[in-house]
Amino acid sequence: MQPDPAAIVETLSIGEPLIGLYDAPDPAPFAPLVEPGAGRECVFASYARWREGKTLHLTKEKHGCGAPQLLGVRGRSREQMVKFLVDEEGLRASHELMDLWLDAAPGYQPRHEHILIGPLKAAQYDYLRSVTFYVNADQLAVLVTGSSYYSRPDDPPVVAPFSSGCGQLASVFGDFDVPQAIVGATDQAMRKHLEPGLLAFTVTKPMFELLCRWADDPASSLHNNFLRQLITARGGSF
C-alpha cells in the first residue's frame, strides 16, 4: 500500500505534483496518457502535462530521448556517445574519462514493456520504482535532512550523481530495494523545461516509505523549532 506523503507536502508547502516512475505491464491504469513528440524529445518536455495530471508513456517504439537511460535502447554506438558527450557537450575533459564514467553507471533494466512517468497512482504502487519531489532550496534542505533520519554514518543516503535528467530518475540507483535519494535536475539540457528555482529530489520506494514514516514522527526534524523558524522567516510558507 502506498504511504501518504500529505504531511510532507502540506508542511513544506510543496506545490508541484509528486512524480512517479513506473515500470508496468499495462499502461491503461495510468490514463490520461501522452506520448513523446517526434525525434529525441526530452522526457521533461512533458513537465507541463504532468502538472495537468497526465502521464508520459514510453516504449521501445516511442521513447523520445529517454530510451538509453530508461528502456535499454541504444540510439548511438558507445564511441558516438562518448564523442557527443565530450566533444559537443563538454561534460568531461577527455574521452577516456567519459568512458570510465559510463562504465561505472549502474544502468536501468526495465521489467516490463511500458515506462510511465507522471503523478502518483496509489493503486499502481506495486510498479513504482522512484518518486520525485520538485522543490526549491528550502524544501530540498528539509528533505535531505529527513532522508538521514534512519541512516547509519557509513551508509550516506543522499548523493548527487552525474547523469542525464531522465537517468537521475532511475538508472543511477542500481539497487531499488535500498533506501536511496539523489539530488537531481542538474542536467543543463533538461533544465529549460523547469522553473529556474526547482531542483529534483528523487527517491527509491523504500526511501519514500521511510520519509513518510519520518513525517509522521512528531519527534522528527519535520516538526522542530528550526523548521518553524525557517517557515516564519519565509513569510509563513515555502
Q: How should these model regions be labeled?
A:
Residues Q2-F238:
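Acidic, serine/proline-rich low-complexity intrinsically disordered regions
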